[in-house]
């Protein structure tokens, strides 16, 4: 059990059997009565935001969550297949639960998988990845005056905007949270 004094950004709590992540919290004392904690929570099952107010000292549940190191193996229909690195069990995760992160997965890549009551909830990618450009149009020579970008398809199939000087075969660093180009490797 967590008390409201334990609240911090990113803490995962359970309310009425539903897991939430604390996005924002603020302690406040109204003119009358005891102190309160106003929170903004993200439902981890459906990604919806919820506002909730707790009395100071109120207890909330601790969800049965664990993070496991897994290796991405392959795509099977709409599922992504991962292997647990400690037990060697295979785990199927529906692609739509990954919130667009599946586009960054390469075969044999290691990721952390968040499990809630033994069921996969989300995958945790590194903040940045280095991927190879497989398709992009050639840049016009001398067009370096402005900050112009062009679309480029990466080895995993996602398309990002890259500067004009990036060519096919270049390895680029990409921010996995924003899909922004960070530089060449």
Curated annotation (Swiss-Prot):
<dbReference type="Pfam" id="PF08207">
    <property type="entry name" value="EFP_N"/>
</dbReference>
<protein>
    <recommendedName>
        <fullName>Elongation factor P</fullName>
    </recommendedName>
</protein>
<dbReference type="InterPro" id="IPR008991">
    <property type="entry name" value="Translation_prot_SH3-like_sf"/>
</dbReference>
<comment type="pathway">
    <text>Protein biosynthesis; polypeptide chain elongation.</text>
</comment>
<dbReference type="InterPro" id="IPR013852">
    <property type="entry name" value="Transl_elong_P/YeiP_CS"/>
</dbReference>
<dbReference type="InterPro" id="IPR020599">
    <property type="entry name" value="Transl_elong_fac_P/YeiP"/>
</dbReference>
<keyword id="KW-0251">Elongation factor</keyword>
<keyword id="KW-0963">Cytoplasm</keyword>
<keyword id="KW-0648">Protein biosynthesis</keyword>
<dbReference type="InterPro" id="IPR012340">
    <property type="entry name" value="NA-bd_OB-fold"/>
</dbReference>
<dbReference type="InterPro" id="IPR011768">
    <property type="entry name" value="Transl_elongation_fac_P"/>
</dbReference>
<dbReference type="GO" id="GO:0005737">
    <property type="term" value="C:cytoplasm"/>
</dbReference>
<comment type="similarity">
    <text>Belongs to the elongation factor P family.</text>
</comment>
<dbReference type="Pfam" id="PF01132">
    <property type="entry name" value="EFP"/>
</dbReference>
<dbReference type="InterPro" id="IPR015365">
    <property type="entry name" value="Elong-fact-P_C"/>
</dbReference>
<dbReference type="GO" id="GO:0003746">
    <property type="term" value="F:translation elongation factor activity"/>
</dbReference>
<dbReference type="Pfam" id="PF09285">
    <property type="entry name" value="Elong-fact-P_C"/>
</dbReference>
<dbReference type="InterPro" id="IPR014722">
    <property type="entry name" value="Rib_uL2_dom2"/>
</dbReference>
<dbReference type="InterPro" id="IPR013185">
    <property type="entry name" value="Transl_elong_KOW-like"/>
</dbReference>
<dbReference type="GO" id="GO:0043043">
    <property type="term" value="P:peptide biosynthetic process"/>
</dbReference>
<comment type="function">
    <text>Involved in peptide bond synthesis. Stimulates efficient translation and peptide-bond synthesis on native or reconstituted 70S ribosomes in vitro. Probably functions indirectly by altering the affinity of the ribosome for aminoacyl-tRNA, thus increasing their reactivity as acceptors for peptidyl transferase.</text>
</comment>
<dbReference type="InterPro" id="IPR001059">
    <property type="entry name" value="Transl_elong_P/YeiP_cen"/>
</dbReference>
């Amino acid at each position: 059990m967590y008390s409201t004094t334990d609240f911090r950004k990113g803490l995962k709590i359970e309310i009425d059997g539903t897991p939430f992540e604390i996005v924002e919290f603020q302690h406040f004392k109204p003119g009358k009565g005891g102190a309160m904690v106003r929170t903004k929570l993200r439902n981890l099952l459906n990604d919806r935001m919820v506002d909730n107010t707790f009395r100071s000292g109120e207890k909330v549940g601790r969800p049965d969550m664990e993070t496991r190191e897994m290796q991405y193996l392959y795509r099977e229909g709409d599922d992504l297949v991962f292997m647990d690195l400690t037990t060697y069990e295979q785990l199927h995760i529906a692609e739509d639960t990954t919130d667009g992160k599946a586009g960054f997965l390469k075969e044999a890549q290691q990721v952390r998988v968040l499990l809630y009551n033994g069921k996969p909830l989300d995958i945790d990618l590194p903040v940045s990845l280095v991927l190879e450009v497989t398709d992009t149009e050639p840049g016009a020579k001398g067009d370096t005056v402005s900050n112009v970008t062009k679309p480029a398809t990466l080895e995993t199939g996602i398309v990002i905007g890259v500067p004009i000087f990036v060519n096919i075969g270049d390895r680029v660093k990409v921010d996995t949270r924003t899909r922004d180009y960070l530089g060449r490797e």
